[in-house]
Each structure stands twice: as structure tokens, then as C-alpha cells.
Amino acid sequence: MSAYSLSAGQGPAQAHPIESGCMDLPHMGVIRVLGADAVSFLQGQLTQDVALLGQDRAALAAYCNAKGRVQASFIALKRSAEEVLLICSRDSVAPMVKRLSMFVLRAKAKLSDATEEFRMIGLCGSAADALKPGATPWSRMDDGAAMVVFLYPGAGVSRACWLAPAGTPPPTGPELPLAYWHWLSVRSGIAMVGPATFEAFVPQMLNYESVGGVSFKKGCYPGQEVVARSQFRGTIKRRAYLVHAQAPVAVGQEVFDLSDPEQACGLVAAAAPCPDGQGYDAIVSMQTSVAAQGGQLRAAGAQGPSLTLLPLPYPLLEDI
């Protein structure tokens, strides 16, 4: 383990960003899918090719309705040939266990809420780099009893998710406030879908296909035809963009362009206050035509906070 110390309940009081450390992630939960058919069952439910997951790789995945709208998104990792863990918003665990269980039928797979069986910690900066220098996003390693998934960086800061059975000695590092993790997650440009944005987007509206969250080579899953058609026919009209605002913005707020203030052109998918106290950063799923024009953007109405576009930290895949 790296040579830092984590002291529970003693977060720093600094308002400025600290680029290395650890924090518990109590807002995240874990769904366990267990059984001989766990992988094949999920293969028919998620946008990800679960069969390709291995001991060295995790992946972003989404569960969609029949119209291709994302109900929840996950970080999927295979713990064994018969056990897959899905990391998601804690508020999504119960409804997703219930929803997915409806389709198990005769498959040898059982879904359960395993949140209390694990501890999840976010690692930032050198606390993440020390475990595997140069790790690429979605790569995975085992660290004793723990599983570590390396995520997309945020604001140039490396990130990783450490997951281990409850009671496992945690990684060590300066403890950071959870708000810093939320901000880094926003700056990564990847918005996770939970109850607040349930069925608000198809995967491409969040750039999931550009960050490895959609497989176009696997078999069917709910909404697959819509997702594939959007990609192959070039009908992607909305993308996720990073923006900055000087005033608070919130998930679920509509976004408007002052050239057409009566018609929303986007929706806030994720938002967090900047650690330096200078406003908010957010991920907005927005019409590509409006983003290309660089219009005068506002959140929550024409009189709402002004939004300034920021560069995405990853390239977008062109329409196939």
C-alpha cells in the first residue's frame, strides 16, 4: 500500500483543492449478481460486453429501457466466473435489484444488495498512482482482498475506486472531503445515472460510447436497437459537455440558449461546487448544434446562471 494515512471522520478544513488523498464513498452502492449464469444474464441486460471482463479490466455499463433510455449506470467488475459486482448510485441499488430480478426467470443468477458487505474508498492523485503507475481508465488490479478500478481522471488528477470486504484494512492517505470527489467526477466528463436522471438520456447523450460504456459487437439487450440506430445512422443530436457557472447549478435543471429562451436545449446531468469556492462545474447533455454555435447558455431559465463551455477531457467517437 502507499505511505499515507486515512483517519476516519477527520476531513481537512481547507477550501482549496488537494490533489492527493482518499475519501469514503457512502453515496455509492454495490449490487451482487451471483450464480452459474451471472455473466450470461447480464450480457443480455447491459450495454457492456460483460463476457470480456477479466481480472485486469472493469467497465462502464448502463441498463436501458426498451426505448434506449438509461435507467441506471454501473461500474461492472467480475469477481469470479460466477460473481459480478455492479457499483452504482446507492439510491439505484434497490430499484435495480428489483427490476433486473424480474428478468432472471430460469437463469441461475441471483441479485442482491451487497452494499453493507463492502467498503468503498476513492483514491486521488498519487494515492491512486502509487498502486499502478500509468494505469489506464477501466483497468483493474487486486490489492490483497481489495479490488481497485482505475477511473478517468478529473481536472488532470488520477482517480481510482478501492472496493474490499467490510473490515479490510483501508488504503492510507490524507483524508479528503467527499465534495472533492464529486467535483473530480464531474471534471472527468462522465455522469453516472441515478434516480434524479432516470430515463433522461440514451447512452450517447452522455458520451458513454466514447468512454467504453457501450459495445456495438455484442448481442441484444433492452434498448439495443435504439442505441445502435443512433450510432450507425448518425442521429446523435445531443452530447455531454463540461460547463462552468459562477452560481449554483443542480442535477435535473434544464439548460437554455438565449437565442431561443422558450425551448430547453439541454439538461444538467451532474454538478458539483469547485473546491476553490469559485462557482460550480457541471456536465450538461445538450444539443450538439447549440454547443457548436457557442451560444449564451443559462441553467434553469433565461435568468439563471450563465454557463461557459469547458473542453472535454477525452475525444468523442465519430458517428460510425
Where do the PLM segments sit?
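Acidic, proline/glycine-enriched N-terminal capping motif
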Residues: M1-L60, C64-Q71, S80-A81
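Short amphipathic beta-strand starts and helix->beta connectors
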Residues: P12-I18, A61-S73, V104-A107, M141-V149, ...
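Acidic, low-complexity central loop/insert segments
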Residues: E19-M23, H27-V30, I75-S188
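Short, conserved charged micro-motifs
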Residues: D37-L42, V93-V97, A127-K132, A166-G173, ...
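A common structural junction motif
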Residues: D49-V50, S101-A109, T172-W181, S259-A264, ...
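Short, conserved active-site entrance elements at the starts or edges of catalytic domains
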Residues: L178, W183-S210
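Glycine-rich, small/acidic residue-mixed loop/short-helix segments
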Residues: L206-G213, A228-I320
